[in-house]
A protein has these predicted regions:
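Glycine-rich phosphate-binding loops of nucleotide-dependent enzymes
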Residues: 1-183
Length: 183
């Protein structure tokens, strides 16, 4: 079986094997990962000597067999996990891993820098299934929906939720619906 036949069988239709390539003009360096390593609690290496640079306009895929560290690398890049060693720079600024005992507060700090994270399994890791759509829109943005006394401002929460539901065409348009019922 040729590569082309195998690819056609995988997608269920003939595919174009040669795609026209646009000129490659890499932009400024956006993300630089240098010698990132991660060990588990027993000292077993989960990531070893990870090095790469991402430039503006590039699309990079991190691929591998399940269990080979892709998820762990993305968790490091989004501040959800600390590397054992190494350095990560975003827009020329070193990300603040050093001197920390844990990753508490890093995801919020990274969001302020413009770094986001879309989990592999959004129902397992991205939402609380038994909470409403509106309640789930608060997570990670608590400081933006509080009133002057530091309490949640439910009008702001409802406005934020309505805006997100409209922007992403969430159906049915019911902010009180349990998010675990959505597809």
């Amino acid at each position: 079986t040729s590569k082309e036949q195998l690819a056609n069988m995988m997608v269920g239709r003939p595919i174009q094997s040669e795609l026209p390539r646009a000129a490659y003009n890499p932009g400024a360096e956006v993300l630089k990962v240098s010698n990132v390593q991660l060990k588990d609690a027993n000292g077993v290496a989960l990531l070893s000597d990870i090095d790469f640079t991402l430039r503006a306009g590039e699309v990079v895929a991190i691929a591998g067999v399940s269990g080979n560290g892709q998820s762990e690398l993305l968790e490091i890049l989004s501040g959800m996990r600390l590397p054992t060693s190494g350095k990560v720079e975003f827009l020329g600024q070193e990300l603040p891993y050093a001197g920390r005992a844990n990753a508490d507060g890093l995801p919020a700090a990274f969001r302020k820098l413009g770094i986001g994270h879309v989990p592999e399994d959004r129902l397992r890791d991205g939402v609380i299934k038994d909470f409403s759509v509106m309640q789930n829109t608060v997570f990670g943005y608590q400081d933006h929906v509080k009133n002057r006394w530091g309490l949640f401002d439910f009008k702001k929460i409802a406005q934020r939720c309505a805006g997100l539901m409209q922007a992403f065409d969430v159906r049915p348009n019911n902010p009180d619906l349990r998010i675990g019922l959505l597809s």
